[in-house]
Amino acid sequence: MLQMRARPWVVILAGGEGFRLRPLTRSISGDDRPKQFCAVVGTETLLGDTRRRAALVAPANRTLVVVSKQHECFYRPLLADMREPSVVVQPENRGTAPAVLYALFRIAKLAPDDLVAFLPSDHFVSNDQVFMAHVSRAFEGCRQQTDLVTLLGITAACAELGYGWIEPGRPVAGFHFADFRRVRQFWEKPTVAQAEEFQTQGWFWNSFVMVGRASTILELIKQAVPSVYEAFAGVRPMLGTRGETEAIERLYCGFPAVDFSRNVLSAVAADLAVLPVRDVYWNDLGNLDRVIATWRHLLEDAIPQIMPNKLPA
C-alpha cells in the first residue's frame, strides 16, 4: 500500500515590533501598528502578502502564524478566517528564537518528522510563484537528505550593510542538487569594504526563510541554546491543553530576548545549507530607505506597461 507523503507546514513569524517604520505605518494606517499589519507596499498588509505566499506550498490547516498578545487589535481582524489553534499567541515578544521554538514544539507534538518552512511576515517579494518555487525546492532537498536544514540566500544586488550575509561553502556532499551549498559562516553588520567583497565573491543575503524537519531544527536549537530549549521543553506537555496559555505566560514572564540568527544560526552554521534565490526582487523593508527602494522598483517595473512608447531608444 502506498504511503501518502505528508504536506509540509509553514510558520509565519508576525510577532515583531517594527519600531523603525512606526512613523511610516502611523501615517498610512492612522495608528501605532507594526509594519506586518500595515499595507506598506500595495493595498494588502505585509502579513496578508505572506499568507498568500504560504498558501502556495501549505494548506490552511498546516499554516501557523506566531503573533504577540499586545498586537491583538491589529492581528485579530487579519486572521479572523484562521482556526484558533493556527494562531500561536506569545504573551510578549521575546525575539525570534522563542517564536520559532514555540511554533516548532506545537508542530513536533503532532508530527515531529514533518517538514516546516519559516517565513518572516514583513518582507517584500516581487514574484510569489518564483520565490515559493525555491521554498518547494528546499522542501525537496530536505526529503532527499533528512538531516538538512536550508536557508534561502538572496543573490545580492548591492553591497548592503544592514543585511546579514551568508558565506557559502562546498556543495552538500552526496547530494544530487548541485545548487545546495553548505554554510561556511554568517556575517553581520559588515564594513563597506567587507560588503563589497562579499558581493564580488557571490555571497548571499540571509532571507531568514528556513526549511527543515521540525525535529532536526529543534535539535540544532538544543545544541545552540540549551537553556532556552529546555525552558520550552518543560511546557511541552501542556501544549494543546487548557493549561497551555497559563504555562506559556509563566514561561515568558521575565524570559530574556533571544535572537535566532545571532544566537542559533551562527552557532550551528556548519550544520546548515543555503539555496540561492535568483530572478526575484526581495527586500526586508527594515527601514524607510528600503521601503523607498521597493516603491522605486515597483514604479520602474510599471513604467513600460503604463507608457510603452515613452521608453528611450
Located regions from the model:
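Conserved N-terminal catalytic core of the sugar/cofactor nucleotidyltransferase
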Residues: M1-G15, R20-P34, A39-S136, E140, ...
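Left-handed beta-helix
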Residues: M1-P8, G212-A313
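Hydrophobic packing residues within well-ordered alpha-helices of enzyme cores
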Residues: L21, Y75-R76, A195, I217, ...
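Conserved beta-strand scaffold positions in the cores of enzyme catalytic domains, especially
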Residues: F37, V87, V149-L151, V274
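A conserved hydrophobic position in a structured secondary element of the catalytic/binding core
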Residues: V67, L119, P190, G212, ...
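Conserved core of the sugar-phosphate nucleotidyltransferase
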Residues: N127-F255, A269-L272
